[in-house]
Amino acid sequence: AVGADPVAAWGPATHIALGEAILGSLYLLPPAIQAILERFPLHFLYGSVAADISFAKKYVPEGRHCHNWEIGEEILTSAGSDRLTAVGYGYLAHLAADTIAHNVFVPRQLLLTSTTQALGHTYWEHRMDMHVGEGFLSLARHVVVDHDHSEADALFDDVLSRTVFRFQTNRRIFRGMIRFQGHERWQRVFGQVLANSRFDLP
């Protein structure tokens, strides 16, 4: 089955960039969805990164993985407000984007650039995040760190199977990771890796 395997997923900056592209093309969506996303774009963007907040995913029961399509649909149907519905649509957009990453982009890059096999999926995830630009990583930090998403987090806590951490703990870890990605030293180190790379994005 075609799945949204998180092992080969996009990073937060890429998910935000894709989310912004959707928000810029709302005329393509059904009117009811368009109206909700127009009113709650921030909630949609939070949903578009939220699927990666849960850690230790391998410990959840079979079929309750946070990157499972049925889980995404359950989050959407469990939404009790238009704000949470926007979060649910963002969550599903995340899974759709990861499906492309897992089944098209990353396998192609690994096939074409066999010398990056050791670095694998994480390398290309960070390459794409660097490619979309610091502006989208800054926006990801703004969306996740600077706003109160307790209502959405409560929905995730209710729907998602517990890993070894509560969702609130997962969110604190994820916020730290996003801050780290924006750290000047990390960007300098990965920038040097890119400067020495023979491989370009298509």
Provide a role label for each language-model segment.
Residues 1-90, 96-202:
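N-terminal leader/auxiliary helical segments
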